[in-house]
Amino acid sequence: MWRENKGFSTIETMSALSLWLFVLLTVVPLWDKLMADEKMAESREIGYQMMNESISKYVMSGEGAASKTITKNNHIYAMKWEEEGEYQNVCIKAAAYKEKSFCLSILQTEWLHAS
């Protein structure tokens, strides 16, 4: 406020408004993307855990190498086992991954089971 005026000048009002507008147009979308990436990372972590459990079950007992669909934390995961030469690929896909599945490979053996 200049020269003991009782209100704000137009320049002060416009600069404050433009500052708030700048903050809203830059920080809010970045915050939104950060939250979406956090949900994606959590979903991927759950997917890795399920793949690890399935691989561990296969290695220990020789069972569990079947493709299946699992629902966990309101997300649907599709786990698929594939043979590729002497390897078994375990791939998992979910809607949260934006159609990008990820896979882990293990050596396929008929004799290496704990039981």
Swiss-Prot record:
Disulfide linkage: none
Residue spans crossing the bilayer: 13-31
Modification note: Processing of ComGE in competent cells requires ComC.
GO biological process annotation, one example: establishment of competence for transformation
Compartments, record wording: Cell membrane; Cell surface
Residue ranges the record assigns to the propeptide: 1-7
Presence of keyword Heme: no
Membrane topology: Single-pass membrane protein
InterPro entries attached to this UniProt entry: N_methyl_site, T4P_transformation_protein
GO cellular component: cell surface; plasma membrane
Modified residues (N-methylphenylalanine): F8
UniProt keyword annotations, A-Z: Cell membrane, Competence, Membrane, Methylation, Transmembrane, Transmembrane helix, Transport
NCBIfam families membership: T4P_ComGE
Role of this protein: Required for transformation and DNA binding.
Name of this protein: ComG operon protein 5
Organism this protein belongs to: Bacillus subtilis (strain 168)
